[in-house]
Amino acid sequence: MEAIWLYQFRLIVIGDSTVGKSCLIRRFTEGRFAQVSDPTVGVDFFSRLVEIEPGKRIKLQIWDTAGQERFRSITRAYYRNSVGGLLLFDITNRRSFQNVHEWLEETKVHVQPYQIVFVLVGHKCDLDTQRQVTRHEAEKLAAAYGMKYIETSARDAINVEKAFTDLTRDIYELVKRGEITIQEGWEGVKSGFVPNVVHSSEEVVKSERRCLC
Amino acid sequence: MSDKDDSETPVTTEVTPILGDGNCEPAKNSKSFDQSTEPGSKSGPVASTRKRPEARCSNDPKAAEVLPVQASQAAGKEPVSKEVPQTGWGYWGSWGKSLLSSASATVATVGQGISNVIEKAETSLGIPSPSEISTQVQYASEVRDAGRNNILCVSGPFGIFSTISTAVQSTGKSVISGGLDALEFIGKKTMDVIAEGDPGYKKTKGLMNRNSTLSQVLREAKKKEELWTSSEVTMETDKKTHYGLLFDEFQGLSHLEALEMLSRESEIKVKSILNSLSGQELETLKLELEQLKEAFSLAEFCEEEEEEKKGDEDFTKEITDLFSSLRISSRKVTGVKARNTAYEWIGTSLTKPLAEKEEGEKYLEVESTEQVNKNSIEDIHAFAIRSLAELTACSIELFHKTAALVLHGQKQEVTAVERSRTLSQVTVVLCKELSVLSKEFTTCLTTAGVKENADVLNPLITAVFLEASNSASYIQDAFQLLLPMLEISLIESKTESPQNLEGQRRFDL
């Protein structure tokens, strides 16, 4: 059943080096937290299915980008083919928060003619004592750019699930309303395959009922 | 290189399964291939879904043998054609040209007679039967006009043939007046190149000649497999044996796509750099790029027969060593882990039947042992396919990461040519590993399936070999995608810090 999904969304995860992008993704896709993590080289790939409504699954293809400046020219190339993105900063690192503007500017330039639905993520919220960015100012910044704001922790598994599924739901709504459409030559949204026999879990339920009668 | 385009155009690609290609093992099993497509067998769809486009033509050694003969024949009797179709290996083309220009305008004296020349040349090339040659010569002169077309046809996918023959053609005149040495040399070189063997340049050219990219091929395969899986409503169990789906699950497709993207970008960059250069600078650079290209023609794969299976640590050590000489962190070498897991599994599944037997004697559970064995051939097959897909995906990831690091890594401590050679070695090691692994799995299958019907067992074995062979091809193709990145790296090291480079070269040598 694993292979059945309605759509495939490609999400990109960006933000300064060491804010915890790879750890967040690993927590989400593998359910574990790595104490030590090598810096990402170029880009890495992960995927997971998300059930947004009973029986409706979305396959997320998550592109984990290197935060290091030297790989920027590689990672830039991936904005274009993403429908959604998580823009991370580290709440204990003010610099990474200040750089959020730059990240947004850069994506704006390279995503043309498409658009990316972003969510602003304040990461490492387990380290509240070392906090350098208040929730209030982060929310303000997010609102200014029309983004949602969420605070997460990969280590303590706080809001990780929510960050990804909320974004997925938002994108799904846009797709349903036709504001985002599947396009040839664009990898952001792809329709999944639905097996012709078993359509969705509702039908499975129906047929089971029939059997009972 | 700028002339690569030309070699890409006259391509006749055809979809053929690549048997015994790069990996000598699967060839043995080609006979049993037809069986594998029988509808009932599980491997049927696996075998039929994914065929890798492969450059056609000239696997035939005869074609290669005849070629120089035809070429020199043509050279002797026909005026030298100067429109040198620069294809592929520009090295040959330019070499031929320089030979031509160095030769004076001496008119060809066909005093010795062309057949003499050919005979001598052929003998020096070590071609056995003179009678065979004379028939070839006859044949060649008979169908000379057609033959010329043939040359073109043969040389289509393999630019080298046409350039060699052009070189022979263009030098023909001076050769005859100036002695046989040059012709011998050309002939020898030709034979050397041909003898370098299929893997080498079939691989070099294989990818470039295709109209579709490797990831497209694999993506289509995956789609087909998805469709097939969904229409059959078989779900989990069958998904386990679908190489394409598994390859994607291990993110092989994504890494491949990313690698292709980098490769394309770099290729464009290299071209524009070459276009901006001229004169001596261009010539020097071209020469250096050719050296790089040579490092990309792979070493022979089929010579590992005698090596047999080496110790477990050897592969790990070899790969790690190779990567440390690339100055790339071996922590990124995920393939090692995947491969070790596979071996552990093989280890346990090989000892399992024995242990089972002993326990069976104790507990007298004959039926359950049979059940275990029955399950295990399918299990082994599924695990084999999974392992191959994983190892291949990891290898592609490895190449993708290497590409990123070559382009944006720390300052270079190793030259691009050295890196190319090492990567070529890595490719060989990975492919050998696939071959060894597939042998292990099939041994496993054979052992576990002694009591099985051959109709059940053979398709499974065939599928394992087929996927191993395909895997090796994907890895080799992915390796070829690295060339533009190394070209960039070479150019950058030249332009950015010429003094430093000199120093480093000396240090490294």
UniProtKB/Swiss-Prot annotation, chain A:
Q: Where does GTP bind?
A: S17, G20, K21, S22, C23, S37, T40, G67, H123, K124, D126, A154, R155
Q: Where does Mg(2+) bind?
A: S22, T40, D64
Q: Which UniProt keywords apply?
A: Autism spectrum disorder, Autophagy, Cell membrane, Cytoplasmic vesicle, Disease variant, Golgi apparatus, GTP-binding, Hydrolase, Intellectual disability, Lipoprotein, Lysosome, Magnesium, Membrane, Metal-binding, Methylation, Nucleotide-binding, Parkinson disease, Phosphoprotein, Prenylation, Protein transport, Transport
Q: Where, per the database record, does this protein carry Phosphoserine?
A: S201
Please give the InterPro entries that the UniProt record associates with this protein.
P-loop_NTPase, Rab39, Rab_GTPases_membrane_traffic, Small_GTP-bd, Small_GTPase
Topology in the lipid bilayer: Lipid-anchor
| Record annotation: effect of changing Q68L | Constitutively active mutant locked in the active GTP-bound form
Which EC class does it fall in? hydrolase
Query: What's one GO MF term for it?
Result: GTP binding
| E.C. number(s) listed in UniProt | 3.6.5.2
- What GO terms fall under cellular component here? cytoplasmic vesicle membrane; Golgi apparatus; neuron projection; plasma membrane; vesicle
In residue numbers, the region (Switch-I) covers 35-43
Sites of S-geranylgeranyl cysteine lipidation: C211, C213
**Organism superkingdom:** Eukaryota
Tissue-specific expression? Highly expressed in the brain.
Stated regulation of activity: Regulated by guanine nucleotide exchange factors (GEFs) including C9orf72-SMCR8 complex, which promote the exchange of bound GDP for free GTP. Regulated by GTPase activating proteins (GAPs) which increase the GTP hydrolysis activity. Inhibited by GDP dissociation inhibitors (GDIs).
Decide whether keyword DNA damage is in the record: no
> Which purpose does this protein serve, as stated in its record?
The small GTPases Rab are key regulators of intracellular membrane trafficking, from the formation of transport vesicles to their fusion with membranes. Rabs cycle between an inactive GDP-bound form and an active GTP-bound form that is able to recruit to membranes different sets of downstream effectors directly responsible for vesicle formation, movement, tethering and fusion. RAB39B is involved in autophagy and may function in autophagosome formation.
Domain notes from UniProt? Switch I, switch II and the interswitch regions are characteristic of Rab GTPases and mediate the interactions with Rab downstream effectors. The switch regions undergo conformational changes upon nucleotide binding which drive interaction with specific sets of effector proteins, with most effectors only binding to GTP-bound Rab.
* Similarity section: Belongs to the small GTPase superfamily. Rab family.
Subunit organization:
Interacts (GDP-bound) with C9orf72; C9orf72 in complex with SMCR8 acts as a GEF for RAB39B. Interacts (in GTP-bound form) with PICK1 (via PDZ domain); a PICK1 homodimer may allow simultaneous association of RAB39B and GRIA2 to PICK1 which is involved in GRIA2 trafficking. Interacts with isoform c of RASSF1; the interaction is strong. Interacts with isoform a of RASSF1; the interaction is weak. Interacts with the DLG4/PSD-95. Interacts (GTP-bound) with HOPS complex components VPS39 and VPS41.
Q: What is this protein called?
A: Ras-related protein Rab-39B
Which species does this protein come from? Homo sapiens
Q: Which gene encodes it?
A: RAB39B
